[in-house]
């Protein structure tokens, strides 16, 4: 006959302890946030279920403000009793403060200029029909190679705003066709299309692009025309748009300087200060930018 230890028997008879319930109340949070941010009644507020955050004593709650087809997201951190909320971000001092966006920025196979292995990477999401993008493009192309010839690498990402710019996406497709045929010619096209932006319409876009091809080096106009007609590079443009949406971009130009988000047209003086500050920071931090790859060729004599 087996005897169950008395302590074990007593524990077995105790009622199972339930996990303490969160004091979080969605309705109360919505009412509070609507008042806090002066949200108009026409805006729908959708509140996600709480989830663990980087801080053990706080839960993360994502709140979505929906107005028609537009959505704006906010993150709140809620105390376990549901009485205190923090609006903003939680930063880890051991990581780049812009790590979340840096992890989403994919630059492989994107048009680029500047020094490979540069300590500062600038990624710009742009629209060929956007007037502000035209101004920012001019700022970047004229100033960066002179001021930071070895320190900045620029990557271009398509983000055409189709709802308001009817020829922006076809132009993006054309740009990717050119990049696919001759990567160096992409930047000629980039500069040309912004310079001639006011002359282009949805009806004359193809003819204008083919005119450009006649003056560009190492471009086959017939091949370019076929690529545009078949929309052979539309998937590349769509992938760039999807990346922009994942980053919650809703305006152009939007730039990321080593992950730091800059929205709108930045005057050169302001942008230069940001880049200079980032260069100084990276001297010690070394948590962003590119690391130039070394090509090591095996030496058979070492075997």
What are these regions (language model features)?
Residues 1-4:
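Positively charged n-region of N-terminal signal peptides that target proteins for export
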Residues 19-87, 210-303:
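C-terminal cap of thioredoxin/glutaredoxin-like
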Residues 104-120:
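A short beta-strand-turn-helix
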Residues 123-214, 247-250, 277, 282-302:
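Structural alpha/beta surface segment adjacent to cysteine/selenocysteine redox centers
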């Amino acid at each position: 006959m087996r005897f169950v230890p008395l302590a074990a028997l007593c524990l077995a008879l105790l009622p199972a302890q339930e996990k303490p319930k969160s004091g979080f109340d969605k309705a109360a949070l919505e009412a509070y946030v609507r008042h806090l941010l002066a949200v108009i009644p026409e805006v729908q507020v959708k509140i996600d279920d709480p989830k663990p955050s980087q801080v053990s004593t706080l839960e993360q709650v994502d709140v979505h403000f929906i107005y028609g087809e537009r959505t704006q997201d906010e993150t709140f951190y809620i105390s376990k009793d549901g009485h205190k909320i923090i609006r903003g971000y939680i930063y880890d001092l051991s990581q780049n403060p812009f790590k979340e966006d840096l992890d989403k920025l994919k630059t492989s196979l994107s048009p680029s200029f500047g020094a490979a292995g540069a300590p500062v990477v600038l990624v710009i999401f742009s629209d060929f029909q956007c007037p502000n993008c035209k101004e920012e493009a001019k700022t970047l192309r004229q100033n960066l190679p002179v001021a930071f010839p070895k320190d900045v690498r620029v990557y271009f990402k398509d983000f055409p705003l189709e709802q308001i710019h009817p020829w922006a996406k076809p132009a993006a497709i054309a740009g990717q066709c050119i990049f696919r045929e001759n990567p160096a010619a992409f930047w000629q096209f980039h500069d040309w299309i912004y310079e001639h932006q006011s002359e282009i319409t949805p009806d004359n876009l193809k003819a204008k692009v083919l005119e450009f091809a006649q003056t560009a080096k190492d471009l086959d106009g017939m091949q370019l025309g076929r690529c545009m007609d078949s929309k052979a590079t539309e998937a590349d443009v769509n992938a760039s748009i999807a990346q922009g949406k994942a980053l919650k971009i809703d305006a152009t130009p939007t730039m990321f300087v080593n992950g730091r988000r800059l929205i709108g047209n930045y005057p050169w003086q302001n942008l230069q200060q940001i880049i200079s500050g980032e260069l100084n920071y990276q001297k010690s931090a070394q948590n962003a930018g590119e690391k130039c790859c070394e090509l090591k060729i095996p030496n058979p004599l070492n075997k």
